[in-house]
Amino acid sequence: MTERPRDCRPVVRRARTSDVPAIKQLVDTYAGKILLEKNLVTLYEAVQEFWVAEHPDLYGKVVGCGALHVLWSDLGEIRTVAVDPAMTGHGIGHAIVDRLLQVARDLQLQRVFVLTFETEFFARHGFTEIEGTPVTAEVFDEMCRSYDIGVAEFLDLSYVKPNILGNSRMLLVL
């Protein structure tokens, strides 16, 4: 008798508050290298933006995460994509980004931005490198009112320059 191969694709679902400690652990794995450190309160405040991946063979263990943050009426940002290092190469990051892009489409966003070191990864999803900040002067001025550090990074404000050195700015038109 031949055993059917198991479907080992990750299950990607909305994050719950109970997932925040696992998200924090994933982020901490990459903090200071390719992701900014995030404290627990910041993650709890943004939990509604996060999606997590569970691997079916690991009894619901969170093995990846990512968030979609709306920046403006037509523009979102994918941020904080992280995969358990033991699980890289299994399509988990791609599954998360695919889900986040679907959410962006559902929200009727027209463009999605990412600030990343992982240019090849995001290029496989159709992102292209850009220069500057792809918003009008009026929108730029309004966005400067945000307290979100990620928005400041998107705007390339001088006080966040140390956070973004070496990152590439990429954009996908949906």
Curated annotation (Swiss-Prot):
Keywords: Acyltransferase, Amino-acid biosynthesis, Arginine biosynthesis, Transferase. Gene3D superfamilies: 3.40.630.30. Inhibited by L-arginine. Residues 10-148 form the N-acetyltransferase domain. GO terms for cellular component: cytoplasm. The keyword ATP-binding does not apply. It catalyses: L-glutamate + acetyl-CoA = N-acetyl-L-glutamate + CoA + H(+). Its EC number is 2.3.1.1. GO terms for biological process: arginine biosynthetic process via ornithine; L-arginine biosynthetic process; protein homotetramerization. CDD domains: NAT_SF. The keyword Transferase applies. It comes from the Bacteria. Pathway: Amino-acid biosynthesis; L-arginine biosynthesis; N(2)-acetyl-L-ornithine from L-glutamate: step 1/4. GO terms for molecular function: L-glutamate N-acetyltransferase activity; N-acetyltransferase activity; protein homodimerization activity. SUPFAM superfamilies: Acyl-CoA N-acyltransferases (Nat). Catalyzes the conversion of L-glutamate to alpha-N-acetyl-L-glutamate. L-glutamine is a significantly better substrate compared to L-glutamate. Was identified as a high-confidence drug target. Homodimer and homotetramer. Belongs to the acetyltransferase family. NCBIfam families: PRK07922.1. This is Amino-acid acetyltransferase. It comes from Mycobacterium tuberculosis (strain ATCC 25618 / H37Rv). The gene is argA.
